[in-house]
């Protein structure tokens, strides 16, 4: 699911990236 944890974490740049 999450490729990058840094962008996947809540409050970060893109939480949507977690779904991609």
Curated annotation (Swiss-Prot):
One of its GO terms (molecular function) is toxin activity. One of its GO terms (cellular component) is extracellular region. Expressed by the venom gland. Disulfide bonds: none annotated. Residues 1-20 are annotated as: Disordered. Keywords: Disulfide bond, Secreted, Toxin. This is U27-ctenitoxin-Pn1a. Residues 11-20 have a biased composition (Polar residues). Its main location: secreted. Has a vascular smooth muscle contracting activity. Causes short-lived contractions of both arterial and venous rabbit vessels. It is found in: Secreted. The keyword Secreted applies. Contains 4 disulfide bonds.
């Amino acid at each position: 699911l999450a490729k990058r944890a840094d962008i996947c974490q809540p409050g970060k740049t893109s939480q949507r990236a977690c779904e991609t």
